[in-house]
């Protein structure tokens, strides 16, 4: 059985599993077939063990169907295939093609506006030439090695990152990239709502790469910085220096890639930079507030390349993680915070880590200025404006409308006595979201759903928790709702 059979197997599996599952666990596998045995190579033991447990049986079934009823013996090990193989399904993604890097596209007004508003901190390779040279429009000459500024925040490390179920996969993938930059997970695409820790993980990767190799050239920047540097380089007739700078790094970390939307020339330059880095075995890491395919006004060829490596969602933190974050931040601030107080804040602030930390800072400041002890009543008074705003933003009505629209049913169906599966499951999802995202009690939630008993709400919440463990479709739906309602 040639290795192309493995690619056919991947085509089948891709249609069966959600995109994130497929890209995370199956796509990185490499294959080698010899004498009736298919050896699958995983990038690390974590992936190998997970595939063995969750996917191996289905892989064997698909291979058997594709091979005329005779399944090869499938083995797994950590490492790389002994000869070049292509573990990536390319049927929908064109292979990298060397394109002329010069384009007829011009800089848009929006890109010029960005360049005018972003503070001037361009790399030395693109520094403005002397007035005389600028008047003659001569290309800027760069002598010797390029000096890189990482702009990494040294306080954002893996040690200071609080891990929980919501970010466990993202942290594991980030750590793997830091240990093996330019490896299987290239590019690494981290996406999720605001304030969930994507930027922290990105800095942690960069800091860990530098810790392991102090000579590594790591560049972190927000996407508007890339746009501003490109516009300045064009204005100074220094586009070659711009390209040389960004393509000479060992790891390029771009934050908030969605900012490239509607900026055609920036997308063009990043497309070629992206290709050059991947072809050179250099690591690319990007963050975004949404899944790659959901980014509007961005070229399809660029969005497709984001999916070549590993795409991981960073989810809103669950209660236990929120409590752990608060306790860790309080410890760093040398503030005594009881577990009762931490739980109170964590139960009230559910949306993201940034808002959670902001709430804690406000409570600590009020306690410092008033000399008060941090207790639940004191916290409630300190955060009354924030809690009122939070409750207003995420209401049961909003949840019901969002869920009904998503499942293409009516809000009245959610409130009715109907018990068909097409209504019952969305109703349970909406109840669970109401419990997690609002401060309403179970009886209040029950009243909002047609006068149901609080035990019905509790059963619905438990059911959705169970289904998220066993049903990929429900898990993906729930994650989508959390993003829609909290960002």
Curated annotation (Swiss-Prot):
Domain text: Domain I is involved in oligomerization and binding regulators, domain II is flexibile and of varying length in different bacteria, domain III forms the AAA+ region, while domain IV binds dsDNA.
Family note: Belongs to the DnaA family.
Region (Domain II): 79-150
PANTHER family (UniProt xref): CHROMOSOMAL REPLICATION INITIATOR PROTEIN DNAA (PTHR30050:SF2)
Segments of this protein annotated with the region Domain I, interacts with DnaA modulators: 1-79
Spans annotated as Domain III, AAA+ region: 151-367
Encoding gene, per UniProt annotation: dnaA
Residue sites binding ATP per the record: 195, 197-199
Subcellular location: Cytoplasm
Region (Disordered): 78-138
Keyword Hydrolase attributed: no
Transmembrane intervals: none
GO biological process: DNA replication initiation; regulation of DNA replication
GO MF annotation list: ATP binding; ATP hydrolysis activity; DNA replication origin binding; lipid binding
Matching SUPFAM superfamilies: P-loop containing nucleoside triphosphate hydrolases, TrpR-like
InterPro entries, sorted: AAA+_ATPase, Chromosome_initiator_DnaA, Chromosome_initiator_DnaA-like, Chromosome_initiator_DnaA_CS, DnaA_C, DnaA_dom, DnaA_N_dom, DnaA_N_sf
Protein name: Chromosomal replication initiator protein DnaA
Function: Plays an essential role in the initiation and regulation of chromosomal replication. ATP-DnaA binds to the origin of replication (oriC) to initiate formation of the DNA replication initiation complex once per cell cycle. Binds the DnaA box (a 9 base pair repeat at the origin) and separates the double-stranded (ds)DNA. Forms a right-handed helical filament on oriC DNA; dsDNA binds to the exterior of the filament while single-stranded (ss)DNA is stabiized in the filament's interior.
Species the sequence originates in: Marinobacter nauticus (strain ATCC 700491 / DSM 11845 / VT8)
Disulfide bridge partners, by residue number: none
